[in-house]
C-alpha cells in the first residue's frame, strides 16, 4: 500500500537543459501526476559558466542553497587554492540540503560527478541521525568513489545492471541497490526527412568526439565527405579545443557548430538525423542521448560500455571504444543501408515505448520510496 500524502525533497542540478536537470524534471512531473508532493532544492555548480550570456539559469520553482565559495566554481581558470576551497565547501552543502528537506518523507539526491551534486555533500550522511529517508540516484560513478557513503543511504538507484555489479563488487549491500532505467519523454514522430548526421552533447574527448573527428578524416581520405552538426550546451573553451582538433584532422570544413536547443528543437533535430552517436570511451551510466534518440526513432552508434547495450539491445550499432577505424566502417555501412536505418529506428522506438516511459520510471521509484519507509 502506497503511503498517502507522500512528500519528496529532490536535491538536483536544476540548470536549464542540463541532462540531469531534465531527468529530474521529467521524474518530478511523473511523480506529481501520482499525487506525490515534490520540493526542488538546488545550488550553483561549475556548469554555471556555460550560462554567462543567458538571462535564465533554472527551470520552474526551486529553493537555492548557497555557500560563500560558490563563485569560485564559476571560474574556469581558478587557482589551486580557490579550487581546494571550492571543493571543501561542497561538503557542508549536505547539511544545507538536508535542512531544506527536513519536513519531507524522502530526500532524493540526484548524484552526478560534479562537485555540488557529487559525493562530497554525501559525506555528511553518517552524522545526519534525524531527518527524512535518503535515496541516492547515482548517475555517474566518480573515478575514485567514496563507496562507504552509500552504506548510509536507505536506498541507492542506478541506471544499469553493469553499474549495480560495479557497486556490489565495491561492497555496497546488494539489497540496497535498485536498477531503474533512465527515462525518455514520449514524442510524436512528425514524418521529417532524415538528412543530418548529428552529435548531441559536449564535443569533448571524454564523449568520444575526438574519435569521431578521426573517423571523419578516415572517410574523407577515402573520398567520403560527411557533414556533422554539433548541438549541445558547451563553453567557448570546449568549442575552441574541439575546433582545434577538427583542424588537426583536416575536417574543420565538415563541422557545423550549434548551441543549445529547446526541448522541441532537440526532438526536431533528432528526428531529422539519419543516426547519432553515444560513443563514450569510458562508461556512462544511463545516457539521455540514447533514450531520447530511441524515443525519436533515431538509430544510435554506440560503444558497449556502461550498459548502453541494456538500453539499445538489438537496436544498437556497436563499435569498440577508442577505435576510429571501426567507427568509420560502421558510419559508412549504415549510411549506405537505408533499409537498416529505418528498421533500427523503428525497433529502437518500440523498445523505448515499452521500457523507458517516465510513468514506468516513476512507478518503480515510488516502490523504492515505499520500501525504505516500510523498512
Predicted regions and their residues:
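Glycosyltransferase donor-sugar binding loop
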Residues: 227-241, 259
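Acidic donor-binding loop of glycosyltransferase active sites
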Residues: 270-285, 298
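A short, well-ordered alpha-helix in the C-terminal region of glycosyltransferases
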Residues: 333, 340-355, 364-367
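Nucleotide-activated donor-binding/catalytic signature segment of Leloir-type glycosyltransferases, i.e.
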Residues: 240-267
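Conserved donor-binding/catalytic core segment of Leloir-type glycosyltransferases
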Residues: 9, 189-207, 213-216, 229
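A conserved mid-protein helix/loop that constitutes part of the nucleotide-sugar donor-binding site
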Residues: 21-26, 204-218, 240, 291, ...
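Donor nucleotide-sugar binding/catalytic pocket of nucleotide-sugar-dependent glycosyltransferases
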Residues: 143, 154-188
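Conserved acidic donor-binding segment of nucleotide-sugar-dependent glycosyltransferases
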Residues: 314-324, 333-338
Amino acid at each position: 500500500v502506497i503511503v498517502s500524502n507522500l512528500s519528496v525533497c529532490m536535491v538536483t542540478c536544476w540548470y536549464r537543459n542540463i541532462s540531469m536537470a531534465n531527468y529530474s524534471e521529467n521524474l518530478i512531473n511523473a511523480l506529481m501526476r501520482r499525487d506525490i508532493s515534490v520540493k526542488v532544492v538546488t545550488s550553483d555548480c561549475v556548469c554555471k559558466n556555460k550560462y554567462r550570456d543567458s538571462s535564465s539559469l533554472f527551470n520552474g520553482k526551486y529553493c537555492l542553497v548557497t555557500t560563500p565559495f560558490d563563485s569560485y566554481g564559476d571560474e574556469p581558470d581558478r587557482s589551486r587554492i580557490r579550487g581546494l576551497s571550492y571543493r571543501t565547501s561542497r561538503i557542508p552543502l549536505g547539511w544545507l540540503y538536508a535542512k531544506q528537506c527536513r519536513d519531507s518523507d524522502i530526500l532524493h539526491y540526484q548524484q552526478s560527478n560534479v562537485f555540488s551534486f557529487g559525493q562530497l555533500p554525501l559525506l555528511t550522511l553518517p552524522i545526519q541521525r534525524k531527518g527524512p529517508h535518503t535515496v541516492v540516484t547515482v548517475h555517474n560513478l566518480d573515478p575514485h568513489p567514496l563507496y562507504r557513503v552509500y552504506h548510509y543511504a536507505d536506498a541507492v538507484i542506478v541506471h544499469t545492471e553493469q553499474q549495480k555489479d560495479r557497486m556490489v563488487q565495491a561492497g555496497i549491500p546488494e539489497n540496497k541497490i535498485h536498477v531503474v532505467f533512465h527515462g525518455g519523454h514520449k514524442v510524436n514522430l512528425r514524418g521529417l526527412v532524415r538528412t543530418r548526421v548529428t552529435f548531441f552533447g559536449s564535443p569533448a574527448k571524454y564523449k568520444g568526439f575526438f574519435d569521431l573527428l578521426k573517423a571523419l578524416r578516415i572517410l574523407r581520405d577515402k573520398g567520403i565527405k560527411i557533414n556533422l552538426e554539433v548541438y549541445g550546451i558547451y563553453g567557448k573553451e570546449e568549442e575552441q579545443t574541439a575546433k582545434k582538433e577538427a583542424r588537426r584532422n583536416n575536417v574543420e570544413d565538415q563541422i557545423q557548430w550549434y548551441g543549445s536547443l529547446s526541448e522541441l528543437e532537440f526532438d526536431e533535430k533528432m528526428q531529422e538525423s539519419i543516426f547519432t552517436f553515444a560513443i563514450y570511451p569510458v562508461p556512462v551510466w544511463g545516457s539521455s542521448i540514447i533514450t531520447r534518440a530511441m524515443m525519436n526513432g533515431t538509430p544510435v552508434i554506440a560503444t558497449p560500455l556502461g550498459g548502453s547495450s541494456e538500453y539499445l539491445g538489438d537496436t544498437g550499432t556497436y563499435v569498440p571504444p577508442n577505435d576510429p577505424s571501426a567507427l568509420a566502417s560502421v558510419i559508412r555501412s549504415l549510411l549506405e543501408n537505408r533499409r537498416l536505418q529505418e528498421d533500427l529506428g523503428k525497433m529502437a522506438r518500440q523498445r523505448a515505448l515499452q521500457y523507458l516511459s517516465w510513468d514506468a520510471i516513476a512507478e518503480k521509484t515510488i516502490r523504492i520510496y515505499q520500501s525504505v519507509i516500510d523498512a
